[in-house]
A protein has these predicted regions:
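N-terminal capping segment at the start of a domain
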Residues: 5-33, 133, 225, 321, ...
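Flexible, glycine/charged-enriched surface loops at secondary-structure junctions
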Residues: 24, 56, 163-168, 251-265, ...
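A non-catalytic alpha/beta surface segment that caps or lines the substrate-entry region
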Residues: 27-73, 77-83
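Active-site metal-coordination/substrate-binding segment of hydrolases
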Residues: 71-168, 173, 193
């Protein structure tokens, strides 16, 4: 391997020590001031490598690695996000390295929280490898600090080995990807790449150029509260309206769907007798099917409202991101270039669609074609997240192979 295992692991551990949880309740970019800490650290490290790097007013980090020899090649962008998911704590992450010999891995001090192949069958693939795991109280942050570390280690390798030929490389690190806003203020024109890759995938080999179309929805339920002792025929309980609404939807949920099947996902609920609110995300690979899901919400609300003299349920839908496939169908040489790089390293590309989204989806629709590459981590967004060290090294090796090989038109 050309990439230093010791260096990239130290780099990853340094980055996950900084809390960068994004905040979905904030309208600012970045949504959390904590994201600045990693942004400034990355900018400092890039400049220490002798590269031109900057952080803009919205916490986007960009840098350039000038071409060496291969000046006629397209400018390739490499992008990862700095924030971690608000689904689990990212504060005071205490990673540890274990040599996995099979069976269960105790995460917490008492051994009551364990990472096991019974819960996560893919774990068995990593017998004999070193894994970075959590202490059972936080997520790890491999999503996407593994991608950040892989890109930074590539930059370190190329700047310490100036004899290696490569084309011009643009580096971008974004805030707020986990709350769907990572690419919204990204300066595509200023980035000036011909195409790019996000490094935000999971297991070794993942190469993704298709993702969900996505929308979110807020369902507001208006009740009528009176004293429960005199409520017959009068009280309308907003929480029961909410329960009725959710139970009426098709049973197409994350826990019951797979592959190319879309879903309705209830992500939050709150309420009193007077007012209740449901938050959903809607996902589908087919844009028309996503529109049908939106219509289903409206029809469900209308059906419940028809039982009352007043409009008791209102639905607000917001589009989030679109499937990048419609952009990349005409630029498949970008996907092929990455696939060929993987194959030269003995990796079989895995081209299954992303049951989620990446910054690359939005960037592709903004004119920067941007498929997604693996970063190596697994079980994102929770305490069972882990990162096989060989996978992290291979992510950086793949980037090195991509940027040092001529792109075929």
């Amino acid at each position: 391997m050309r990439i230093s295992k010791e260096s990239i692991v130290k780099r990853f551990l340094r980055y996950v020590s900084l809390e960068t949880t994004s905040d979905p309740s904030s309208e600012e970019t970045p949504s959390s001031d904590k994201e600045w800490d990693l942004a400034h650290l990355l900018c400092f490290e890039l400049r220490s490598m002798g590269l031109a790097a900057s952080v803009d007013d919205h916490c986007y980090v960009t840098a350039t690695i000038p071409a060496v020899g291969m000046t006629s090649q397209p400018v390739i962008g490499l992008i990862a996000h700095m924030d971690t998911s608000p689904d689990a704590s990212g504060r005071n992450v205490k990673p540890r390295i274990v040599h996995y010999e099979g069976g269960e891995i105790p995460l917490d001090e008492t051994g009551t929280i364990t990472l096991t192949p019974q819960k996560f069958p893919e774990l068995i693939q990593y017998v004999g490898q070193e894994l970075i795991v959590t202490d059972g109280t936080t997520l790890l942050g491999a999503d996407d600090k593994a991608g950040v570390a892989a890109i930074m280690e590539l930059a370190n390798h190329l700047t310490t080995h100036p004899e290696i030929p490569h084309g011009e490389i643009r580096i971008g690190f974004t805030p707020d990807e986990e709350i769907g806003r990572g690419a919204s203020l990204f300066d595509v024109e200023g980035f000036a790449a011909d195409f790019a890759y996000t490094v935000d995938g999971g297991a070794v080999g993942e190469l993704q150029y298709e993702n969900f179309n996505a929308a979110s929805a807020t369902i507001h339920c208006h009740g009528l509260n009176v004293h429960p002792g005199d409520a017959k025929g009068k009280m309308i309980n907003a929480m029961r309206l909410a329960m009725d609404f959710d139970s009426t939807l098709p049973d197409q949920r994350p826990s019951t769907t797979e592959g190319r099947e879309g879903f309705y996902h209830l992500t939050a609920m709150s309420g009193t007798v007077e007012e209740a609110e449901l938050e959903y995300i809607l996902r589908d690979f087919d844009s028309e099917a996503l529109e049908e899901r939106k219509d289903t919400l409206l029809r469900t609300a209308a059906a419940i409202n028809s039982r009352y003299d007043d409009e008791r349920i209102t639905v607000t839908v917001r589009d989030q991101y679109r499937n990048m496939l419609e952009c990349l169908l005409y630029r498949m040489e970008i996907v092929d270039h990455a696939a060929e790089a993987m194959k030269r390293l003995g990796i079989e590309p895995i081209t299954s669609p992303i049951r989620g989204g990446t910054d690359g989806a939005t960037l592709s629709h903004r004119g920067l074609p941007c498929p997604n590459l693996f970063a190596g981590g697994l079980n994102f967004h929770g305490i069972y997240e882990y990162l096989p060290i060989p996978s992290l090294v291979m992510a950086a090796e793949t980037l090195l192979e991509i940027v040092t090989t001529e792109v075929r038109s």
